[in-house]
Amino acid sequence: MRASRGEITIEEILQESGLNFKEEYSFPELTAPNGTPLRFDFAVFDDDWDLMFLIEYQGRQHYEASSKFGGKKALYRQQYNDNLKRRYCGLHNILLIEIPYTDEHLLSFDYIMHRAGWC
């Protein structure tokens, strides 16, 4: 899948910061109803590679139906999967940072650290 502008910006911020991270991170037990693994855009790790937090960039298709992304049916599926991810993180005490597309212009290392509660 092609990365969005927001995802590219986040990747650049993580690379420049020197943080350990992986893209398209998934957990074996977290799947969509059809069995497809649900992936998080980024997983950020400490120096021992213990998970610190996950980042999800939420493009417009997470909030609005768009024919470009499959219309209302795709929107409902996207929102359902987003809720599965939120529940999973809550149940496993994993910090999930969701960045809406409306905040794309605010993206910076400080923005991410603030959202993680470290500023």
List where the protein language model places each region:
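Nucleic-acid endo/exonuclease domains
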Residues: 1-119
